[in-house]
A protein has these predicted regions:
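Conserved beta-strand scaffold positions in the cores of enzyme catalytic domains, especially
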Residues: 45, 84-88, 190
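Metal-associated gating/positioning segment near the N- to mid-region
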Residues: 92-158, 162-166
Length: 193
């Protein structure tokens, strides 16, 4: 009898751990993965700017070197690769890109017409099953306007009509045909409450 009980207990523990692993993977695997690809770009050297690094440091007459759209060096009198585009930023400021952590761009698109108003599922107080990413319109002109203002990444959330509005998505503010082309690779989801 003890042997049977041990066998049943062992089988139950194996089954429950397999079920738990399946449940965990269901919530951690992304069924709509990012297809974002950085746009290849040559080196760019921004010279003689006032540079705010985002760490509190301010570099007067500073330089910023970019490669493939990413900052690779900040300092003074940086050497530019021979094929670099050099921008004289005398009298101008360079700052890190801004991150909009509470955005409705793409789900409440501009111009504001009912056909593009997908931010809320106002059918119940709790709509945790709603995913903002399914509503994002990547051609929303608001993305371009935000980029002109320095916003390079956004967390797009459902609207505020519910106590729990659903799941948000983090996007890179880049031109794309689909929201998956904007989706920040590996970024965690948010929850609108």
């Amino acid at each position: 009898m003890r042997l049977v009980l041990l066998a049943v207990a062992g089988l139950a523990s194996v089954c429950s751990s397999a079920d738990a692993a399946t449940a965990r993977s269901r919530f951690t695997q992304d069924p709509y993965p990012s297809t974002y690809r950085a746009i290849a770009a040559g080196p760019v050297l921004i010279r003689h700017a006032t540079v705010l690094t985002g760490t509190g440091e301010r570099v007067e007459d500073g330089d910023v070197l970019l490669q493939d759209g990413k900052v690779v060096a900040v300092g003074r009198s940086l050497e530019a690769p021979a094929d670099a585009t050099v921008i004289d930023a005398t009298g101008r400021w360079v700052t890190p890109g801004l991150i909009d952590v509470h955005s409705h761009l793409g789900v409440y698109s501009s111009p504001g017409v009912n056909a593009h108003s997908d931010g809320n599922e106002a059918t119940a107080p709790v709509t945790a099953n709603v995913w903002a990413e399914h509503s994002v319109w990547p051609q929303d002109p608001g993305f371009h306007t935000a980029l002109a203002g320095g916003v390079t990444s956004l967390q797009v959330l459902p609207g505020s009509a519910n106590l729990v509005g659903g799941r948000g998505v983090t996007l890179k503010n880049v031109p794309a045909t689909t929201y998956q082309g904007m989706k920040f690779p590996g970024a965690p989801w948010g929850l609108k409450m």
